[in-house]
From Swiss-Prot:
Gene Ontology BP annotations: translation
Protein name: Small ribosomal subunit protein uS12
The gene coding this protein: rpsL
Originating organism: Porphyromonas gingivalis (strain ATCC BAA-308 / W83)
Cysteines paired by S-S bonds: none
SUPFAM superfamilies: Nucleic acid-binding proteins (SSF50249)
Stretches for region Disordered: 1-26, 103-134
Top-level taxon of the source organism: Bacteria
Basic residues: bias regions: 111-123
Compositionally biased intervals (Low complexity): 124-134
Transmembrane segments: none
Compositional bias of kind Basic and acidic residues: 10-20
Keyword ATP-binding among record annotations: no
Length: 134
């Protein structure tokens, strides 16, 4: 344990917080190109086919990014906008793709939380879009 005199001379060393999305280089979002679009399964208690894309960012780093919402139009060479935010049950996926920007279409038929999924406001008086897959 240091003496008060040692603390006066040297002080305590403070540790800087580590970034949770280091590939973005302190930027809120980054543009990138899809290298591979695929599905993967989540960790143990959960079961699904989660849609994920491998994206090469403009700073030439490659990351795995989650594609939120139901259905998407992404394929290889699509230009996407990537934001931070991990997916808890997918190890190694620490980024999200922003829906409704660049080559990524918004989610069709979405009426609630539309801004999160890039969905346009439905016309007033219009019948709600059909739910489910046909």
């Amino acid at each position: 344990m240091p003496t008060i005199q040692q603390l006066v001379r040297k002080g305590r060393e403070s540790f800087a917080d580590k970034s949770k999305s280091p590939a973005l280089n302190s930027c809120p979002q980054r543009r990138g190109v899809c290298v591979r679009v695929y599905t993967t399964t989540p960790k143990k208690p959960n079961s699904a086919m989660r849609k994920v894309a491998r994206v090469r960012l403009t700073n030439s780093k490659e990351v795995n990014a989650y594609i939120p919402g139901e259905g998407h139009n992404l394929q290889e060479h699509s230009i996407v906008l990537v934001r931070g935010g991990r997916v808890k049950d997918l190890p190694g996926v620490r980024y999200h793709i922003v829906r409704g920007t660049l080559d990524t279409a918004g989610v069709n038929g979405r009426t609630q939380r539309r801004s999160k999924y890039g969905a346009k406001r439905p016309k007033p008086g219009q019948a709600p879009a059909a739910k489910g897959k046909k």
